[in-house]
């Protein structure tokens, strides 16, 4: 299966004072027979095929039409410790803790699964918690840091600690089913661009890597994209999700351009007006 890079390329730009050393995330290694991999793949179900997005609030001319949701719920996943040792990462659990701190500061009720607790069943339970919690007028968020890979025939997937491929169609069928029209979705993982194809009305989605690698910043104990995103919202006044995503993208691209490397962070904005987190 295709995942992140199979080589841990280390970059330490002399003039890159923000991130210091950057490490390319290693490839998700899966030597199981394809039949077994297929049995460890979760894909969209017909159960959610009749979903219709809730009607968004009216456009206010550029501001956030729902700046003060009645309730806010965030489900956060960070996986550095995978089954076995071949696929372990370094800072994804730190990414999750930093995301938790930020979302808590914004008034969110948090549910979080880290490392070996983030099984496929746990992620499904967490996504169902978002669906069960959300009501019209509420806001939800999902944030993931860990391995991303391509599932044969199903495209971009995130990987649970017990090595299930959670495909973009499967994850988004839950997220899109939440009965509210203010939704924030972030992935710090490799090759997760297919998730944007499922981005529904009311959602602001930001991805660290559409079709290339993601990177870690060991000196800062973060994924590079997560570092820039947190830096934007906490230190540079990026209170709107669109601005935070743009700030993170610009930071990664500016660094990569110094070394003629290609990175592909991007965002898809289907929220009406500006998204005040």
Task: For each feature predicted by the language model, list its residue ranges.
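Active-site-proximal beta-strand/loop segments in catalytic clefts of secreted hydrolases
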Residues: 75-80, 113-118, 143-148, 160-163, ...
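A short, glycine/acidic-enriched catalytic loop
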Residues: 122, 147-178, 239
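Active-site-proximal C-terminal subdomain of hydrolase catalytic domains
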Residues: 183-269, 275-276
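Boundary/activation segment at the start of structured domains
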Residues: 5-141, 220-223, 276
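Surface-exposed acidic, glycine-flexible loop patches that form ligand/cofactor-binding
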Residues: 63-68, 130-138, 149-150, 174-177, ...
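Extracytoplasmic/secreted proteins, especially bacterial periplasmic and envelope-associated proteins
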Residues: 94, 98-105, 118, 122-129, ...
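Sec-dependent bacterial lipoprotein signal peptides
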Residues: 1-2
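Short, solvent-exposed loop/turn and secondary-structure capping segments
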Residues: 86-89, 152-156, 196-198
């Amino acid at each position: 299966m295709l995942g992140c890079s199979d080589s841990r390329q280390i970059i330490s730009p002399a003039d890159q004072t923000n991130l210091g050393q950057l490490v390319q995330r290693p490839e998700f290694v899966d030597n199981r027979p394809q039949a077994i991999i297929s049995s460890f793949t979760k894909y969209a179900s017909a159960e959610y095929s009749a979903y219709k997005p809730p009607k968004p609030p009216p456009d206010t001319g550029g501001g956030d039409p729902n700046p003060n949701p009645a309730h806010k719920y965030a489900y956060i996943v960070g996986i550095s410790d995978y089954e076995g040792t071949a696929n372990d990462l370094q800072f994804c659990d730190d990414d999750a803790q930093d995301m938790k701190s930020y979302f808590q500061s914004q008034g969110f009720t948090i549910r979080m699964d880290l490392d070996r607790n983030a099984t496929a069943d746990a992620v499904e339970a967490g996504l169902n918690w978002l669906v069960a919690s959300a009501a019209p007028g509420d806001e939800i968020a999902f944030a993931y840091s860990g391995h991303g890979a391509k599932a044969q025939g199903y495209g971009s997937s995130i990987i649970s600690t017990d090595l299930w491929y959670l495909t973009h169609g499967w994850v988004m069928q839950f997220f899109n089913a939440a009965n509210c029209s203010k939704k924030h979705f972030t992935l710090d993982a490799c090759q997760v661009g297919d998730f944007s194809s499922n981005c529904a009305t009311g959602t602001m989605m930001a991805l660290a890597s559409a079709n290339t690698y993601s990177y870690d910043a060991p000196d800062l104990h973060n994924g590079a994209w997560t570092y820039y995103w947190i830096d934007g919202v906490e230190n540079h006044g990026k209170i709107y999700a669109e601005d935070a995503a743009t700030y993170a993208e610009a930071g990664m691209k500016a660094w990569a351009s110094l070394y003629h490397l290609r990175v592909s962070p991007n965002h898809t904005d289907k929220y009406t007006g500006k998204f005040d987190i």
